[in-house]
Amino acid sequence: MAEAKQVLDVTDIQKILPHRYPLLLLDRIIEFKRKERIVAIKNVTINEQFFQGHFPGYPIMPGVLIVEAIAQAGGALLLTEIPDQNEKLMVFAGIEKAKFRKPVVPGDQVRLEVDVIVWRNTAAKLMGKAFVGDKLACEATVSCQIVPRPAKPENS
């Protein structure tokens, strides 16, 4: 199967993922191969809310948020395969082998490369890598589970 190139901007991403500011961590999808692979971009700026406290005078993107960005990229890939995606959420079921190799700082552009290891209708295991330029910043294996999305309260 030929690799599908597909660019999605943040507006397109918001049609797939339920995340919003300040926790939407994807700015663009630059590669998308159904049920196999996704490559997404996160542009990191000093305006990120987490830099206020992590760490004053030495801003570093929290590693857990890099892993979250990997999971969001995987979610963007896999939720498109769910027929009733507006009624489902993809949530963490596990994080394995997370390694942080290089700090991510304001001004960096993080390239998230996520490959499907196992895909089932209700769960997936993904291998993700986050790069800044050609340097590996983070890698992790994440497991996700698809669950029903709670109904919105009528007054929201």
UniProtKB/Swiss-Prot annotation:
Entry annotation: catalytic residues: H54
GO BP annotations listed: fatty acid biosynthetic process; lipid A biosynthetic process
Any one GO CC term of this protein is:
cytoplasm
Q: Name one Pfam family in it.
A: FabA
Top-level EC class:
lyase
What's this protein's family per the entry?
Answer: Belongs to the thioester dehydratase family. FabZ subfamily.
NCBIfam families given in the database record? fabZ (TIGR01750), PRK00006.1 (NF000582)
The protein here is known as 3-hydroxyacyl-[acyl-carrier-protein] dehydratase FabZ
Q: Give the source species.
A: Koribacter versatilis (strain Ellin345)
